[in-house]
Each structure stands twice: as C-alpha cells, then as structure tokens.
From Swiss-Prot:
The lineage of its organism: Bacteria, Pseudomonadati, Bacteroidota, Sphingobacteriia, Sphingobacteriales. The active site is at Y294. The keyword Lyase applies. NCBIfam families: Hepsulflyase_CFB. Its EC number is 4.2.2.8. Changing H295A: Impaired catalytic activity. It comes from Pedobacter heparinus (strain ATCC 13125 / DSM 2366 / CIP 104194 / JCM 7457 / NBRC 12017 / NCIMB 9290 / NRRL B-14731 / HIM 762-3). SUPFAM superfamilies: Chondroitin AC/alginate lyase. Keywords: Lyase, Periplasm, Signal. This is Heparin-sulfate lyase.
Amino acid sequence: MTTKIFKRIIVFAVIALSSGNILAQSSSITRKDFDHINLEYSGLEKVNKAVAAGNYDDAAKALLAYYREKSKAREPDFSNAEKPADIRQPIDKVTREMADKALVHQFQPHKGYGYFDYGKDINWQMWPVKDNEVRWQLHRVKWWQAMALVYHATGDEKYAREWVYQYSDWARKNPLGLSQDNDKFVWRPLEVSDRVQSLPPTFSLFVNSPAFTPAFLMEFLNSYHQQADYLSTHYAEQGNHRLFEAQRNLFAGVSFPEFKDSPRWRQTGISVLNTEIKKQVYADGMQFELSPIYHVAAIDIFLKAYGSAKRVNLEKEFPQSYVQTVENMIMALISISLPDYNTPMFGDSWITDKNFRMAQFASWARVFPANQAIKYFATDGKQGKAPNFLSKALSNAGFYTFRSGWDKNATVMVLKASPPGEFHAQPDNGTFELFIKGRNFTPDAGVFVYSGDEAIMKLRNWYRQTRIHSTLTLDNQNMVITKARQNKWETGNNLDVLTYTNPSYPNLDHQRSVLFINKKYFLVIDRAIGEATGNLGVHWQLKEDSNPVFDKTKNRVYTTYRDGNNLMIQSLNADRTSLNEEEGKVSYVYNKELKRPAFVFEKPKKNAGTQNFVSIVYPYDGQKAPEISIRENKGNDFEKGKLNLTLTINGKQQLVLVP
C-alpha cells in the first residue's frame, strides 16, 4: 500500500467518525435562528447589532461569547436537580462510569437495569427491555450531565466533543412528529421536562469547550426553546407529572431569560403550581396520590419552584398560603417517617438513603428556619426539637401513625386506610409497616416495576395484589374499593385506638380496629361484615431475614433474630382459624426483589353473619416467644366497638377497656 493511499484512508476514517458532528455544525446560520431570542435583553447589544446588520455568523459568535462570560460569572445551577451536584467535590465512581460508557454509546436509561449498547450509529428507538420506563427514561439522557461533570473535573475534550455529537444526533433523529410511537416516548411532557431541567447546568459546563461552536449554540438554543415551549402547552392533566412539568418550565424561564417566551414559561409554571397545590394536597398535608415517595417529591417540587422564582424576584407570585401548605406537607412527612428516615413503601414507594433524606430536610430547614421539628430531622436530632406529638392521624389521607417516641429505638406503626388514590395507589387498605428498635419487621411489598408489555405488567400486578399486603381478603381477591371511613381515633397515655371501615368487596365491609397498648404492642381486630360468603384471610408479611417459626398448634408465628429483637403475631380467636404459609416477596428498589416469609389466618364465611379475627402483634426481647391468651369479659361487644377484654401475657393480666 502506498503512503498516499494510506493517508487517504486515514482522512476518510476521520471524516466518517466525525460526520455527525460536522453535519451538525456546518449548516449556515440565518436570521431565523434568532427569532426566539430577545435581542433587547441586557448584555446582547453586540448580538443585536450584528443581527441588524445581517452578520449572522458574527451574531452567533457574540451570543456564544455572552454565554461563556455568563457561565464564568455564575456556577451551574443544580438547584432543581433530583440530586444536586457539587462541582467542587471529586467525581464518584458511578458518575465516571456513566460518562465513560456514554463515550461508546453504552447507556443506562434506568437504575433498575444495567447498561445497554445503543450502537455506533445510536439507535434512539431501541427498546432492549419492554419496560416502558426504559424507553421513556432513555430520553431523559441523564448521562449527559455525568459527561459534563467529568469534563469539568478533567478538562478532557473527548467528553465535550461526544456530547455535542450526541445532542445533535438525538435532536436530528427524534424530531417532534416523527411517528406517534416515537412521540409517545421522546415527547411525553414528563421526559421533555426532565431534559429542560437537566440541560441548563450541562450547557453551562460545556459552553466554554472549543467543541461548542457558534453553529452548535444556535442549534442547541432552538432545540431547547422548542422543548420548553412545547412543555408549556402540554402539561399533564393531573398528578405529580403536572407538578414536575410546571416546576421545570418555570426553571427553563429562569435559566434562559434571553428567550422572548421565558416570561410566559415562568408565569405558566407559577400559575399551574398555585392551582395544583390546592387540588393535590389534603388539609392534613398529604399529597393526594397517597404515595410517600411522591409526597416527598411534591415537597421538593413546590420549594424548588419557589426558589427559582426568588432568583428573579417573583416569589411574591406565590401566596403565603402556598408556603404554609408546603410546611404542613413536611410535618405530614415527619408524622409518617420511621426512625431510620424511611417512609412506608405504600403506593409505588421505595426505600431511601438516610443522608439524602437528611439533606432534603436541611434544604427545607433553610426555608422554614423557625420550625424546630424540621431542624431536628435535618440534624439527626442534634439541633431543634422533636415534634410535640407522638401518635397522629392524617385523617384526610388515611395515614395513621402509632408512635412510642422519636428516638431510634422507638416502636412505630404506620397504617394506611385511605380514600381512592391515583395511578400509584394499590388495593391495600389496612396494610402497615411496623418498626421496632431499629428494625422494620413488616415492610410493605414495594413496587418492583411500573408498566410495559404483558410480561412486565404481570410482574407489576403481582405486587399490587391485596393478599400480599397485611390486610383482609375474600377468596384471595383484590379489594374492589379503597374508600376507608374513619370510625374512631383516640390517643392516650397507655392506649391509642383506630377503627376504620372499608367497603372492600360487594356486600362485604372490612372493619379493622388497632389498639396500641402501653406504647408497646398491638391488638388487631378484623371484622368481615355483610352478606358475602367465601374464604376469609387476614394476611401478614415479614422481613426477608426474619427466619420465623410457624407454630400451627398455637396459631402463631414468631421471628428468631439472634440479637433478641423479635416479634410474634398470633391469632387469639376462640373459633377455628387456620394458619397457612404463603408466597412472599418484597422489592426495596426498582426491578429487584427478595423472597420473604408471609402467612395468613383463614376461616370460612358461610352466611351473612359477621366473622371476627383477633390477632396480637407482640414485640419481645430474647429467644423465647411469650405465652398469650385472651378472655372476653362481660359487656364486651365487638359489633358496637365496646371492648372489655383480659389479655394474659406470660401469666400477667392486662385489662383492655374501650367504652
């Protein structure tokens, strides 16, 4: 091979590898590229002059110089990010891996799955797992921010060159209107809002790169404007999606005030949030989707929006009632928080990192410096004061907390008996989580997956079943209605009582009473009321490592933790009730599951008569399960809710009176 031929091959290869980037930046700049820019905006005088003279290349150069100066004067704004980044901290391994794999087009759209190779010529329509979240979240392009952070830390231009290429490639291959199927994933407003939120700090970190040319600047700005403007007229009808989208559109208007439409983006965002906070937040402070994890997200959304408005002196556009509602939401969160800072995994929720949650409380404490309870949670109890309540009912949302204290060894049960929820709600009224001395003995099932093809939906629906929650079923069927009515909520020094009724099935109401006795243990009375007949079951779930003993002779199940922190659940029914093991699973994080112990107390309902289940949930220290029995005294009337019972626990009697 001659030297001349070899050189031609090398030149051709370089051109081929860079073709996407060259195509993206070789297009001529025209007057139309500046249509969305407010050329009268302070700082754009040179841009305005060049545009007026028809020197569009010079105008683009001046605009790039403006943004570069702006980036040097102000740090990238991560205030609206899901997890704010600190550019002064070393790059962690996860971020570095994400950025490096992105260089070879290996992307991780969703944390619940690994990395997928999308090809040298990126296939943005590839759907490696038929989970909708994988296809949706591909277009949140979260690795772009990782690339920007690594670029900032290393100065290695390969990250900037690749990002410019990928952005142009993505924009070219995913135009609005490409197809109904593609639009459903790329242009779903939630994904658009995610990009609108993450792109401003990414832009700021890359804008000083030589790879960031004036031509690419105009391409980027026109693309960003299209996305933000589309978002402003396509908010979701309701729910947390609508909140996310409004907050992020406001952020777009704050991040790029140079756009003519930025004031409208800000105002529509503020207007939607002012309206939705009244619709979506119950008087007790809970967000109406009844999912603790999305409740926390709503708090962040409302306060991030408020912070964005403050940056441009628009905070007065939010009335005082808005701020007060958010504070009430934080107090509701505190009420249902467990001692490890987690919340129950009701309604598609999952566990969270304690330090991350404390950081959230710290950010909220800056908005509400006078609230001592928020400060207490922000500092792990080192500052501020513990809340001035223990057991608390959030009666509108139907979240009830029984609590012995605020220390790490407290006994805390959070029970759900709610009105109908939205997409994330499950048919699970009556289910609960019980946390004792640092251990969650009865974690809720969790979510596992959201939506997708038939195989994915089968996985999701398994976790939605009523029978895999700690509540009552008829013939193991899902409850048809979740519309609990609170009958009684009383708290006292030695006895807290909840009674609610839920119309779970046609012709069958489930009434559950929970008694928290001596701030230590629980008596649970379930009543199946109505004409329906079939097999009744009261289901229970335990932690995956509890290694329980199933004592069918005494109708009890007890854990065997070696540290002596144990729990017994026993049926105290006088009539025949059978104890049976069931399949149990729990999902603490997306697409990850563990087997766990589960069981049910069962008996038939043969006629219209009411059937009762009486169970005791008893924490104890040591390896020997307690001996417990019950006696109904004169005047005890389950039907009227009047209780007169004597519990005998290891030979000691405890009178239980509820008038």
